[in-house]
Structures are given as C-alpha cells and as structure tokens.
Amino acid sequence: MTTETLSLIKSSIKSIPDYPKKGILFRDVTSLLEDAQAYQATIQLLVEKYKDMGFTKVVGTEARGFLFGAPLALELGVGFVPVRKPGKLPRQTVAQSYELEYGTDTLEIHVDAIKPGDKVLVVDDLLATGGTIEATTKLIRQLGGEVEHAAFVINLPEIGGDKRLEGLGLQVYSICEFEGH
C-alpha cells in the first residue's frame, strides 16, 4: 500500500465529534463510500491482501460490513454471507448474543450459509471492542467453518478489539488506524 493510497482512504473518512454521544469522535466510513476512487482503492487493497489465501466465503456483519465484504467476495470469486440482527434473515438461523457497553445484542446467520470446512474471511468497516466480530466468529465456527482472518477498513487500537480478536486466534488486518474512541 502506497502512502498516497493510504492518504486517499484515510482523508476520505470524516470524523464527527460527539456522535452518537458526547465524548465520542465517530469515524464516518460512509464518506469514503461517496468517493469512488477511495472506495475502489479500499476494495483493491483488500483483494491484494487476500486474493491467494484460498477463502471459500466472505462474511460481512450488519450493516457496513456488507459494503466492503460483498464487493470483496465478488472480486475473490467466492460467496458472500451476511450476518444480521435478529429477524432479518428469512431462512432458519443460529444466533449468538454478545455484550455491549450497556446491555447485550444478538447476531444471526443462516444455518446453511457456512459448510463444514469452509475457509472464511470476516469483514467489517470498523474495529473497536471486537464484540461483533467475536460473536460472528463463534457463529461461523459453530457451523463448522474455519475462520482465522478478520479485515477492517478502520481500527481504533486504543479500545483493544484487535487484542480481543487475536485472543480468539484471528489474524487482524486493518487498512488504517485512528487514535481515540
């Protein structure tokens, strides 16, 4: 990745102070999507990183993980599997709950979306605490999939999600990092 490409991607991500609550500096990846050159560069970096690793599925988490996971899956020539909030998937699902700052949330995946032995790459827009990807990883493994890699556009390393996911045996890759929360 050239410094020019990294600069293009990083500068396209807007920072919104005090959103969704006071004291948070929100990294808005939707501004990257508005810039076709930055969006394409992001997908191409992910393709270059993962093109020869033998993945059979790409899993993206709701909702912004879909925006990076689906085009990556197309470029890699593999299927894309969405992981969604409860009640959003039409076929039979399995669910995994996980802890939030205040309470819990749940994610679901179709029971037939991952086959035993599938080699899965998990993709999301941003890594903060790692809770969403930990739950996603548990779902994939419950269905017999092999998941050892997780890719993100943005990592907020001070929050520690990368360490949490490494503790699950995942190799974590992010295109860019930002300080703070």
From Swiss-Prot:
Tell me its EC number(s), please. Answer: 2.4.2.7
CDD domains for the chain: PRTases_typeI
GO MF annotations in UniProt: adenine binding; adenine phosphoribosyltransferase activity; AMP binding
Q: Which reaction does it catalyse?
A: AMP + diphosphate = 5-phospho-alpha-D-ribose 1-diphosphate + adenine
Give the pathway listed in the UniProt entry for this protein: Purine metabolism; AMP biosynthesis via salvage pathway; AMP from adenine: step 1/1
Q: May I have one GO cellular component term?
A: cytoplasm
Query: Main location per UniProt?
Result: cytoplasm
Compartments reported by the entry = Cytoplasm
Keywords in alphabetical order: Cytoplasm, Glycosyltransferase, Purine salvage, Transferase
What GO biological process, any one, is recorded here? adenine salvage
One Pfam family hit: Pribosyltran
Disulfide bond entries: none
Q: Which NCBIfam families match?
A: apt, PRK02304.1-1, PRK02304.1-2, PRK02304.1-3, PRK02304.1-5
Q: Please give the family membership noted in the entry.
A: Belongs to the purine/pyrimidine phosphoribosyltransferase family.
Subunit-structure text: Homodimer.
Role noted for this protein: Catalyzes a salvage reaction resulting in the formation of AMP, that is energically less costly than de novo synthesis.
HAMAP family on file: Aden_phosphoribosyltr
**Name of this chain's protein:** Adenine phosphoribosyltransferase
- Name the species this protein comes from: Vibrio cholerae serotype O1 (strain ATCC 39315 / El Tor Inaba N16961)
